[in-house]
Amino acid sequence: LPVWYTAFWHSSLNGQPVLKPQALVFPHDTAGFDVDDQYFLGDSGLLIKPPTTKGASHVDIYLADDEDYYHHFTGHVYRAPGGRVAVPAPLSDHVPMLQRGGSVVPMRERVRRSAELQRLDPFTLYIAPSHDELAAEGHLYMDDGQTFAYRDDQAFLARKFTLTRDGPGHLRLASTSLTGRDIHTSASSTALQVPGNAYEQETSSVRVERIIVYGLPEVHRIIARDAHGHETSLSFTYTSGTSRSPTASDASARLASRLEIRDPRVLIGQDWSILMEIAP
């Protein structure tokens, strides 16, 4: 739900559709102009293609650019610039959903009976680094979902999550406030999120529960640094990627490496950074 809410917020600001067709995301890729059966969910980096034929075992997804796409549920990697890849799509399983390299997707994963009951639930950040730079970016917008306080009192959270290189063998994952420049509504670098606003205070206990990063080389050490400069060494699990044999219903030749950080001890609405020491 946070991905949808953020997509609708972006749409309210720039007028672009929540479900973006291939031609809108890649306007210079003429080969993708007639692809009308798959879509990107806002600016999240999630590419979705539901099966629409009886008895389908897979779908063929068109990939426009030279980038890795990670299956959200399996971690399989797909790459075929200007080509199509077969992705499993049994009707009894998940809808095919690929996360484009270069994106960060914040999700709430606890199943509730209503959105209101999720209000203070923790988040998981899914990070798919870009193929060349190991960089990524994603946005999150939240308000109370009930009133006009977001408009009248600037009571909302507007966060930007970025993964960048921080010198040889080091990466930095950071949380900062979004600016008008970030969402292309102005040239201003002033933070959109007003510090200490009512919604920020109401959700001040909402934490990041897990961070999952695909496609990294081996990770040696991770340190979290909060807004006050306090540092904490974090435990994590790292699983190396492996090769696999493509099939007629699954074109992936690789299972991505997976880094999982449980309880990184950071809050969703505050500034913080996490430093990762990786193999060169």
Positions of predicted regions on the chain:
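Catalytic core of carbohydrate-active enzymes
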Residues: L1-G229, S240-R244, L255-A256, I261-L275
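Short acidic/polar inter-strand loop motif in beta-rich domains
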Residues: I278-P280
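Long, continuous compositionally biased terminal/linker segments
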Residues: D250-S252
